[in-house]
């Protein structure tokens, strides 16, 4: 039984004779061979939990060992000197990975490996047991805890233990390890690099690697003229870039520029396509671009061959043949066991005899041989294995299909001067492998990157590499070839495309391209790109070490006459931005601000990285010098985060100095300032002749004073001051009057400006200290006004509300259902107060447009969310309800956009007498659109029809009469006609699931349509039967469901002809492919198909409920849906 050892078995008995690793072996190779000879085997098996390990070898950069363990079946432990019954002991045999105490622990990792654990036999067959396992850091051993019993192994007749010695061998292969601490260096380990996957572009990466190692193709791409196309859409330039970087770079290459040149967007990179189809489309695109240039014949010379289709008479000298070119050969896999057998079947001739004789013209009917032969073979032969087929269902054929490393196609060819036997010998160059199922999976490529060298030097061996997107690794020949034959039940992985190279063309088309042979124009272009990328990368790295700051000074604050201290848009757009190092200390920031504001000098060069002892000492000396200075300013960090417990209303943002930056501390900016962009307030003294007052963090509060002058009706920021939080406001009245320029005994009224939307009167009757009276920290704004000029209609709070609520609004007319001849009014802009009554604004609009204001509906919407108002909009009283944003802020939103509609009735009827509903209607051109109506709640279906007629674009020849159908919503299994409502049906009796405000919110809809003239009159024995479209399965509905009149006992052929006339936009050729069926109403199951050659007639008893008239079955039209899903879309290169 295959298992992992018990946890205690993972504890290694230290060994002291571990030799150094054999450097002659590739430590990052794919396979390894381990051996362990256990002498004194009987002694080893005499004690439970004895263990021994082999010398380690390195494979994939990880140490591997054999681990042998003695196990007691009965679980008892015995002394070495006691007599034991060894028949109770089992021999455990494991492969161990990455468990060497001499190596540093690697953390989380995973490595998949397969192995054969073998006990050698001196005279006969050895014991071999296979394992495959995904080793990881918590499960490093895998094998057999009961490989075999001691008695069995020691039986002298079997020859496994000779002279008390047992010989263990292990052959294993391992994939590239993965994990956070594993950085696989493909270039170092293989000399090659991979291509990054953009999402599902593994198919493209696979064929691009094959093209790259076909150096004749790479050389042709290098030599192509890039033309004058823009770089973004230049496929030739993008292909050159990919190949150049694969040759010159040391890390995996991006393919984004190539897919952009194809005209693909980011979503296209997540659509997986067929590698064969992509190969053909790309080669065709490049061949087209090569026409008329020196490389015109490059692709045909590489990939094009010719085959002859022939019919040759056996008894007369007559042959008919046709020669066609090919760029790949597609071979069946189903029923074939090998590539040789598939080629044989492809070119095997058949005999035309008896009733199938060939008409040889003048020779009459003759026995003949019909077949295909290759008359010219290309240097690079692409063999497409047809593993994806439709056999009733879409499936992948994963049968075993072998292919050789060397292939001779002489038996499939017509040899002659143009094609000798030497031209038929091919060597396998690449194997493109698909793992997965029909609708998805993963592509990798195996390439023999040493094929040219081994062809030139017979002593050189194959060097197969596995290209798995950005990971490239060495692999064995068996892994590249035999493992991809398919047929394994556990691994749905098999070769899908083979690339063979003609032996006599290897030297010409696989010869390496030295860097010196790359055209200078190509090298120059991409070297300049590389230098530009390096500069941008260095710039980005430096930017990550820097941060942006804005210095807000008192003069900037004093220029603000509106909300808060400073408009945030000015901070971001008008004030110059500075750049500082994140590793700066606060003292260095003070020096920087001093130099910028007072010395007007640039930032001095400081070694922020302390690159050596001298630089570190210089920086320490500079910091001491700066701290000894007396700066006449203070720095504050301005933030917009705050909370106010005394109100629950949502407040607008504000930007205030809230955190003092102390020059004397040894604090770095990256720990003090958390954002990449910060706003710094520079506090000066209000009086240039006075020094900056002291600041005590435990006592003082930084406050700004804003004065409202009723004479000028304007706010002015006078300056800032420090309030002792333990004192009362009245103690500062004379100081505030002096700052404003008022007499010292002037009575003042105080407000706290918490935010633009919240100005709070300070209640001085409560004899509280400032710290208890106001809920503010540093950065508060005290708004001051004179008591004697403050009135109930003119005061600071009233002015702030006026500034906050007065907005500019753009009014745009909207239509529920626009009449064909109706022209919209022009847009206009108007200033309104958000406290205005909505009807007042409607009256002004009515007077401006000369319409009844009672019919003016004003509403708004969030962009992209909805296009029409709901009932709630009609209940709004003030304009404030039109503001859709969570918090109104006139600083951020300079102009609002509001819709209005001119209704055909007074808007107060909507909530009282009418119901808003949305339905579909079918226009004369066949298109279906949405329609919003407001029928009376007590009305009937005829009221809905009459209201809709006002908007319908009637055309000549129509009936002018409407009907209302209940239909299913667009989920495909529900998209059908359920019933036709009578005109006298009360609106209150309609299925309430169809009466709603949003089309997408319900499973059932209503649809209005004009009644065809031939369906106006319904006689006894006639019935309107629903018709649906479906694609193979009755539940896969699509298209527009409709009804058609049928008559009892009429021929079904007449129904078919009537359907043909109704579907007049369908071509005769397409209609001929339609199949007809009857589907059950309830579950949309197939009742039976309709045949038209047996005189079948309509039986109404089968079609409708005779009491209600509700259809019991549907007529189903079975044909291919015109909707092509993205997963099925053909691959296209647009440029």
Swiss-Prot record:
<dbReference type="GO" id="GO:0005737">
    <property type="term" value="C:cytoplasm"/>
</dbReference>
<dbReference type="InterPro" id="IPR050164">
    <property type="entry name" value="Peptidase_C19"/>
</dbReference>
<dbReference type="GO" id="GO:0061629">
    <property type="term" value="F:RNA polymerase II-specific DNA-binding transcription factor binding"/>
</dbReference>
<dbReference type="Pfam" id="PF14533">
    <property type="entry name" value="USP7_C2"/>
</dbReference>
<dbReference type="GO" id="GO:0006511">
    <property type="term" value="P:ubiquitin-dependent protein catabolic process"/>
</dbReference>
<dbReference type="InterPro" id="IPR001394">
    <property type="entry name" value="Peptidase_C19_UCH"/>
</dbReference>
<dbReference type="InterPro" id="IPR008974">
    <property type="entry name" value="TRAF-like"/>
</dbReference>
<dbReference type="InterPro" id="IPR029346">
    <property type="entry name" value="USP_C"/>
</dbReference>
<keyword id="KW-0539">Nucleus</keyword>
<dbReference type="GO" id="GO:0005829">
    <property type="term" value="C:cytosol"/>
</dbReference>
<dbReference type="GO" id="GO:0031581">
    <property type="term" value="P:hemidesmosome assembly"/>
</dbReference>
<comment type="function">
    <text>Hydrolase that deubiquitinates target proteins. May play a role in regulating the levels of endogenous siRNA biogenesis.</text>
</comment>
<dbReference type="GO" id="GO:0051661">
    <property type="term" value="P:maintenance of centrosome location"/>
</dbReference>
<dbReference type="InterPro" id="IPR002083">
    <property type="entry name" value="MATH/TRAF_dom"/>
</dbReference>
<feature type="domain" description="USP">
    <location>
        <begin position="193"/>
        <end position="503"/>
    </location>
</feature>
<dbReference type="GO" id="GO:0005634">
    <property type="term" value="C:nucleus"/>
</dbReference>
<keyword id="KW-0378">Hydrolase</keyword>
<dbReference type="GO" id="GO:0031647">
    <property type="term" value="P:regulation of protein stability"/>
</dbReference>
<keyword id="KW-0833">Ubl conjugation pathway</keyword>
<dbReference type="GO" id="GO:0004843">
    <property type="term" value="F:cysteine-type deubiquitinase activity"/>
</dbReference>
<dbReference type="InterPro" id="IPR024729">
    <property type="entry name" value="USP7_ICP0-binding_dom"/>
</dbReference>
<dbReference type="InterPro" id="IPR038765">
    <property type="entry name" value="Papain-like_cys_pep_sf"/>
</dbReference>
<keyword id="KW-0788">Thiol protease</keyword>
<feature type="domain" description="MATH">
    <location>
        <begin position="31"/>
        <end position="172"/>
    </location>
</feature>
<feature type="active site" description="Nucleophile">
    <location>
        <position position="202"/>
    </location>
</feature>
<dbReference type="Pfam" id="PF12436">
    <property type="entry name" value="USP7_ICP0_bdg"/>
</dbReference>
<feature type="active site" description="Proton acceptor">
    <location>
        <position position="442"/>
    </location>
</feature>
<dbReference type="InterPro" id="IPR028889">
    <property type="entry name" value="USP_dom"/>
</dbReference>
<dbReference type="Pfam" id="PF00917">
    <property type="entry name" value="MATH"/>
</dbReference>
<protein>
    <recommendedName>
        <fullName>Ubiquitin carboxyl-terminal hydrolase 7</fullName>
        <ecNumber>3.4.19.12</ecNumber>
    </recommendedName>
</protein>
<dbReference type="Pfam" id="PF00443">
    <property type="entry name" value="UCH"/>
</dbReference>
<dbReference type="InterPro" id="IPR018200">
    <property type="entry name" value="USP_CS"/>
</dbReference>
<dbReference type="GO" id="GO:0016579">
    <property type="term" value="P:protein deubiquitination"/>
</dbReference>
<dbReference type="GO" id="GO:0008595">
    <property type="term" value="P:anterior/posterior axis specification, embryo"/>
</dbReference>
<comment type="similarity">
    <text>Belongs to the peptidase C19 family.</text>
</comment>
<keyword id="KW-0645">Protease</keyword>
């Amino acid at each position: 039984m295959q298992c992992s050892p018990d946890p205690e078995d993972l504890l290694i008995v230290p060994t002291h004779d571990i030799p150094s690793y054999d450097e002659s072996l590739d430590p990052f190779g794919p396979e390894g061979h381990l051996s362990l000879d256990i002498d004194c085997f009987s002694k080893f098996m005499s004690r439970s939990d004895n263990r021994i390990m082999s010398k380690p070898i390195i494979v994939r950069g990880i140490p591997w060992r054999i681990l042998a363990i003695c196990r007691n079946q009965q679980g008892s432990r015995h002394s070495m000197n006691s007599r034991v019954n060894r028949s109770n002991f089992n021999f455990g045999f494991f492969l161990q990975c990455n468990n060497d105490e001499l190596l540093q622990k690697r953390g989380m990792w995973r490595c998949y490996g397969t192995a054969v654990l073998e006990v050698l036999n001196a005279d006969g067959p050895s014991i071999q047991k296979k394992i495959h396992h995904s080793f990881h850091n918590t499960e490093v051993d895998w094998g057999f805890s009961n490989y075999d019993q001691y008695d069995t192994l020691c039986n002298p007749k079997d020859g496994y233990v000779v002279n008390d010695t047992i010989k263990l061998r292990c052959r294993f292969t391992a994939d590239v390890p993965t994990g956070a601490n594993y950085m696989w260096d493909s270039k170092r380990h293989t000399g090659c690099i991979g291509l990054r996957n953009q999402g599902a572009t593994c198919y493209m990466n696979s064929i691009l690697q094959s093209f790259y190692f076909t150096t004749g193709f790479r050389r042709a791409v290098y030599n192509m003229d890039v033309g004058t196309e823009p770089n973004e859409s230049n496929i030739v330039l993008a292909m050159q870039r990919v190949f150049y970087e694969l040759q010159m770079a040391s890390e995996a290459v991006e393919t984004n520029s190539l897919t952009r040149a194809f005209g693909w967007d980011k979503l296209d990179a997540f659509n997986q396509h067929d590698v064969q189809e992509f190969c053909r489309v790309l080669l065709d695109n490049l061949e087209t671009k090569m026409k008329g240039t020196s490389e015109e014949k490059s692709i045909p010379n590489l990939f094009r061959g010719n085959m002859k289709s022939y019919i040759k008479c056996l008894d007369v000298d007559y042959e008919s043949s046709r020669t066609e070119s090919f760029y790949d050969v597609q071979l069946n896999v189903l029923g074939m066991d090998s590539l040789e057998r598939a080629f044989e079947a492809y070119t095997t001739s058949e005999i035309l005899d008896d009733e199938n004789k060939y008409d040889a013209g003048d020779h009459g009917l003759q026995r003949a041989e019909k077949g295909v032969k290759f008359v010219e073979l290309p240097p690079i032969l692409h063999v497409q294995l047809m593993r994806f087929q439709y056999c009733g269902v879409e499936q992948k054929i994963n049968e075993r299909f072998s292919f050789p490393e060397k292939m001779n196609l002489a038996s499939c060819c017509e040899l002659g001067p143009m094609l000798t036997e030497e031209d038929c010998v091919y060597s396998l160059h690449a194997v493109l492998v698909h793992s997965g199922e029909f609708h998805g999976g993963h592509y990798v490529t195996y390439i023999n990157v040493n094929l040219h060298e081994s062809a030139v030097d017979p002593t050189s061996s194959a060097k197969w590499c596995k290209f798995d997107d950005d990971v490239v690794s060495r692999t064995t020949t068996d892994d590249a070839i035999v493992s991809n034959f398919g047929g394994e039940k556990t691994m749905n992985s098999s070769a899908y495309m083979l690339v063979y190279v003609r032996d006599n063309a290897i030297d010409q088309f696989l010869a390496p391209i030295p860097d010196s042979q790359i055209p200078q124009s190509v090298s120059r272009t991409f070297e300049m790109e590389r230098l530009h990328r390096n500069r941008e990368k260095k710039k980005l790295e430096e930017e990550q070490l820097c941060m942006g700051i804005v210095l807000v000074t008192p003069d900037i604050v004093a220029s603000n006459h509106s909300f808060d201290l400073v408009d945030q848009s000015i901070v971001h757009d008008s004030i110059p931005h500075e750049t500082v190092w994140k590793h700066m200390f606060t003292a260095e920031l003070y020096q920087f601000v001093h130099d910028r504001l007072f010395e007007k000098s640039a930032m001095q060069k400081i070694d922020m990285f302390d690159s050596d002892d001298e630089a570190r000492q210089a920086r320490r000396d500079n910091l001491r010098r700066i701290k000894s200075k007396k700066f006449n300013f203070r720095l504050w960090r301005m933030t917009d985060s705050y909370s106010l417990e005394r109100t629950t209303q949502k407040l607008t943002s504000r930007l205030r100095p809230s955190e003092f930056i102390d020059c004397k501390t040894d604090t770095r900016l990256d720990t003090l300032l958390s954002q990449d962009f910060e706003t710094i307030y520079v506090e000066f003294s209000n009086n240039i002749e006075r020094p900056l007052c002291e600041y005590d963090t435990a006592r003082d509060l930084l406050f700004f004073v804003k004065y409202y002058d009723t004479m000028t009706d304007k706010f002015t920021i006078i300056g800032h001051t420090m309030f002792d939080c333990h004192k009362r406001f009245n103690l500062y009245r004379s100081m505030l009057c002096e700052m404003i320029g008022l007499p010292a005994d002037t009575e003042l009224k105080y407000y706290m400006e918490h935010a633009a939307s919240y100005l709070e009167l300070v209640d001085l009757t409560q004899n509280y200290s400032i710290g208890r009276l106001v809920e503010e920290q540093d950065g508060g704004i005290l708004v001051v006004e004179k008591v004697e000029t403050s009135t109930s209609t003119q005061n600071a709070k009233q002015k702030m509300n006026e500034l906050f609520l007065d907005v500019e609004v753009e009014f745009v007319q909207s239509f529920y259902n626009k009449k064909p001849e109706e022209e919209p009014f022009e847009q206009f802009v108007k200033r309104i107060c958000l406290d205005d009554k909505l009807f007042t604004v409607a009256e002004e609009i009515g007077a401006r447009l000369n319409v009844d204001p009672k019919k003016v509906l004003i509403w708004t919407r969030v962009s992209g969310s909805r296009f029409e108002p709901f009932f709630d909009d009609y209940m709004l009283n003030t304009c404030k309800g039109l503001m859709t944003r969570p918090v109104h802020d006139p600083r951020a939103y300079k102009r609002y956009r509001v819709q209005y509609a001119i209704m055909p009735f007074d808007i107060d009827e909507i909530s009282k007498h009418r119901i808003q509903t949305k339905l579909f209607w079918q226009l004369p051109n066949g298109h279906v659109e949405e329609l919003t109506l407001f029928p009376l709640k007590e009305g009937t279906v005829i009221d809905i029809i009459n209201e809709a007629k006002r908007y319908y674009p009637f055309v000549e020849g129509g009936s002018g009469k409407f009907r209302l159908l209940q239909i299913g919503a667009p989920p495909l299994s529900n998209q059908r006609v359920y019933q036709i409502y009578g005109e006298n049906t009360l609106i209150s009796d309609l299925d309430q699931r169809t009466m709603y405000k949003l089309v997408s919110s319900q499973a059932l809809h209503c649809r209005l349509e004009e009644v065809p003239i031939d369906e106006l009159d319904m006689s006894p024995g006639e019935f309107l039967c629903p018709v649906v479209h479906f694609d193979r399965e009755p539940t896969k509905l699509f298209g527009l469901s409709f009804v058609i009149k049928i008559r009892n006992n009429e021929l079904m052929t007449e129904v078919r002809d009537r359907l043909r006339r109704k579907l007049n936009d369908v071509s005769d050729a397409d209609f001929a492919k339609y199949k007809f069926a009857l589907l059950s109403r309830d579950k949309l199951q197939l009742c039976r198909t309709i045949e038209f050659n047996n005189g079948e007639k309509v039986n109404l008893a089968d079609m409708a409920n005779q009491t209600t008239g509700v259809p019991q079955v549907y007529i189903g039209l079975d044909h291919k849906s015109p909707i092509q899903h993205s997963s099925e879309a053909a691959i296209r290169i647009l440029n």
